[in-house]
Structures are given as structure tokens and as C-alpha cells.
Design a protein with these regions (language model features):
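Catalytic center-proximal scaffold of phosphoryl-transfer enzymes
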Residues: 1-170
Length: 170
């Protein structure tokens, strides 16, 4: 049922419960719901939600300002990759005023081709960190790139911590 799928998705991604724990919880409630079935349902939902994701991405990319970042994630079983190899969750935030959206997209690569694909059709101001992977899309699409204040703040903190106490005014 849609409510069962909603519960499984929320439990796994918002609450961080692995599927084997959900399987155990359902078993205690007298229901046989295998983690294999749940995994297949989640994979199938990716296909179901793809048109919605495409629409949200298109709406985001018609805005004049976007934020983008990428972060490492661990994927335990992925064809051709070890669990220790870097994989990436890419996030973009933006959209029309009053209706911003935050989109997450997994990609095993951190190559510059990923933001080129994600930001296809965007022409505005991109706020991102200093990662060089955004340079290609900025150059090809004529984007104005601005820095991330949190990353700038971290550099000041690092400089303060590295400075001798005399330089800190103490």
C-alpha cells in the first residue's frame, strides 16, 4: 500500500533504520515483509518518482539562483565498486521565489560532468564551495559563481586556530 511504502521510506531515509531492522520490526508485529522486497520496492519507486524529479529539476533550473553541493556517502553493494570507494550524493536547492525545492541525486562520480548534467538549462548565479568540478558547468553555461559563506567561515576558524596566541591578541 502507499502508506506502507511511505512508512518504509521515512523509516529508512529520515530515521536511518536499515531494512533488516524494519524486517525484524514487521516480524514482531506478525507480518512477513522481507528486506529484499522492501529494497525492490524502493528501487521501483525511483522509476515512479523520476517524472516528478525531472519536473522539479526543470523548475529549479529556470530560477536565477541555485545552491549546489556534493557529499561522500557509503554504498555497501554497488556493482564494480567497493564499500570503501567514494560515492556521491549531489544536492541542489533553488527554484521560484516562495517555492524552493531541495533535490538529492546519487552519482558514483564526482566528475565535472555531473553538475553539467544536473544544471542543464540553468543560467544564473550558482552558490557552491571551491570544488573545481563546478568550473566546467560555470564556463560552459556562463554561470556566475559565488562562494559558500560556511566554507569561508571555516577558513577563518582554521587560521585563528593555527595562529600563535600573540597574533590572536591574547
Amino acid at each position: 500500500t502507499p502508506s506502507l511504502l511511505g512508512y518504509i521510506i521515512t523509516s529508512k531515509y529520515a530515521d536511518g533504520l536499515p531494512l533488516y531492522r524494519l524486517e525484524q520490526m514487521f516480524k514482531r508485529l506478525g507480518q512477513e515483509v522481507s528486506r529484499t522486497s522492501m529494497a525492490h520496492w524502493i528501487i521501483r519507486l525511483d522509476e515512479v518518482f523520476q517524472p516528478l524529479m525531472n519536473l522539479l529539476r526543470e523548475e529549479q533550473n529556470h530560477a536565477t539562483y541555485l545552491q549546489a553541493d556534493e557529499t561522500r556517502i557509503q554504498v555497501l553493494k554497488e556493482k564494480g565498486k567497493t564499500a570503501q570507494s567514494d560515492k556521491w550524493m549531489w544536492v541542489t536547492r533553488g527554484g521560484p521565489p516562495g517555492r524552493p525545492s531541495v533535490l538529492f541525486e546519487y552519482d558514483p562520480s564526482r566528475a565535472g560532468s555531473v553538475p553539467v548534467r544536473l544544471l542543464d538549462g540553468f543560467s544564473g548565479i550558482l552558490q557552491a564551495d571551491g570544488y573545481s568540478g563546478y568550473s566546467q558547468v560555470c564556463k560552459e553555461s556562463g554561470l556566475t559563481r559565488i562562494g559558500c559563506w560556511d566554507h569561508a567561515r571555516r577558513k577563518f576558524i582554521e587560521a585563528t586556530q593555527a595562529a600563535p596566541s600573540v597574533a590572536k591578541g591574547k
